[in-house]
Amino acid sequence: MARKTPIERYRNIGISAHIDAGKTTTTERILFYTGVTHKLGEVHDGAATTDWMEQEQERGITITSAAVTCFWKGMDMSYPEHRFNIIDTPGHVDFTIEVERSMRVLDGACMVYCAVGGVQPQSETVWRQANKYKVPRLAFVNKMDRTGANFFKVVDQIKTRLKGNPVPVVVPIGAEDNFKGVVDLLKMKAIIWDEASQGMKFEYADIPAEVKETAEKWRENMVEAAAEASEELMNKYLDEGTLSEEDIKAGLRARTLAVEIQPMLCGTAFKNKGVQRMLDAVIDYLPSPVDIPDVEGTDPDDEEKKLARKADDGEKFSALAFKLMTDPFVGQLTFVRVYSGVLSKGDTVFNSVKGKKERIGRIVQMMANERIEVDEIRAGDIAACVGLKDVTTGETLSDVDNPIILERMVFPEPVIAQAVEPKSKADQEKMGIALSRLASEDPSFRVRTDEESGQTIIAGMGELHLEIIVDRMKREFNVEANVGKPQVAYRETVRKTVTDVDGKFVRQSGGKGQYGHVVFTLEPQEAGKGFEFVDEIKGGVVPREYIPAVEKGVIEALTSGVLAGYPVVDVKVRLTFGSYHDVDSSEQAFKMAAIFGFKEAARKANPVILEPMMAVEVETPEDYAGTVMGDLSSRRGMVQGMDDMVGGGKAIKAEVPLSEMFGYATQLRSMTQGRATYTMEFKHYAEAPRNVSEAIVAARAK
């Protein structure tokens, strides 16, 4: 089966934005204009095509990124047919993991901003992630029809807040109620959309007198940006004073792909204006799989050995599993991005991370909530496979004889935990299955059993994250659950170095005894460095075969600190000395000796409790700014700054301990009459003040 669309005409793009910038509506319009959906779905009615979990439709926010395939020939049908794979990404800070995961498999991104709200905190997080994966991007300023819309203010904010380099390729005609259309700065024509045909029809017109000067100024800016792409274009521009449409496109494309500039467009998705021109810009400026560097990976047998794969059907097969979903009809769906080669249904592939073979049952391409079965997928494709038994997010699938591990994604540690139990005892097993399914879909969500209480503990990235998990258990698996009060994931560490601490485990009272003896030095490491074990035994005073048992013992002891039983982090343990008995020593004895030795050393090394600190940003009308700052300070928060917002109001940044943020949403609503919003994400662990840690220790001792 030959390829229908040449790979140069593929565009794998993500659409990402802050909540309520109108991202899902924008995606809906794309699907409408590209002919995938015949009736427009509105988030307002809970009928958007990409929001396919019931909860997303109820809450009007997108939680999981659905991958949708569609085709586009340009708004005036002037392009050959291009194939878009669009990944709709969530904009809520509790779901940053989803965004991170989508960024990994995208070639380009479309950042949607609200013309009134401008660059909001979540937009900064997404921008940082796009920088991390070097994703070329466009910016689309949506909601130009809303009161207070200001396109140029958003251009400014992208420069100042995100340190971006935006280059408008259109400018708006009018704003708010009289937003009519845009001026295309390449053609220097006005584009006016026809509302009756829901934006399917449009006309080119002369530029209205009132925007002529603005259009000329920004065209000059755009041509200069394009000219900087190469010496050749710069000379042409200096000689002729302008550039042709082809040259401008080529220059802007080269600089966008190099992540030097971001072409900017505007419109209103809800009123069907401007999205069509944005789709043309995706073709003009965003990369095809061939335009990005070859994907790199390592050899599973030799981590030092770097391998690369070209985006070519002739290459050996490699793909990345970037999302798992449980589907009501076919069971587990594994979304994959194919980087090289061809995958046909029935093929056997190799999961190079786990070292296991997998057989591909069926392959489906997603048209939002419709599925189309296909026989094969090729380099550059994004599709879902059915029938993979043991693949988790971020793992590589490759050719059986030519394995490769594409980079692993790094997932954040959860910061909030809750005990959860089924409402009826009979559902215990069902709940276990549901939670392990959900954990395999979402690596930032963890499940464990508390040894002491036997309770099931779920942990995640925020209150909303866990709320949605519990909600999904009820809807998708019919398990109703009660949840306990949220618990903060505290940690412990030590502050001073102690040397020569003995750990002994001796049971010798006739017959086969037990004997293990170790001597440790315990020292603190800098924050985030993690645990390190160093074997400094000389002359075999502790035999080689027992060293792994000693390390195992220390690792076990790390799970429960000496102050309040929280996990211990950022310490270095040196095994410096010890002794053994020919008959009575065993691995178990040395493991026990190591546990005792570590606990003893930790007690002497000035142990402290660490608490998670959150970066909190509150957007509030100016009248309430003082109240909000006072409240944050009373929560042991450090206010770090205050910025002005586009549509008036203040953005307050602070660092606040997570333990003080429970129930903040309700409190903030009542303080500001529901007019302020906030986002919060984990920043780092910091030492808890003495009175706080004493309270934590006392609470654990009860």
Curated annotation (Swiss-Prot):
From which source organism is this entry?
Acidovorax ebreus (strain TPSY)
Q: Which Gene3D superfamilies match?
A: 3.30.230.10, 3.30.70.240, Elongation Factor G (Translational Gtpase), domain 3 (3.30.70.870), P-loop containing nucleotide triphosphate hydrolases (3.40.50.300), Translation factors (2.40.30.10)
Query: Where does this one sit in the cell?
Result: Cytoplasm
Biological processes annotated in GO: ribosome disassembly
- Give the protein family: Belongs to the TRAFAC class translation factor GTPase superfamily. Classic translation factor GTPase family. EF-G/EF-2 subfamily.
The record's section on NCBIfam families has: EF-G, PRK12740.1-3, PRK12740.1-5, small_GTP
What's this protein's name?
Answer: Elongation factor G
Entry annotated with the keyword Transmembrane: no
Alphabetized GO MF terms: GTP binding; GTPase activity; guanosine tetraphosphate binding; translation elongation factor activity
Q: Where along this sequence does the record place binding of GTP?
A: 17-24, 88-92, 142-145
Q: What is the lineage of its organism?
A: Bacteria, Pseudomonadati, Pseudomonadota, Betaproteobacteria, Burkholderiales
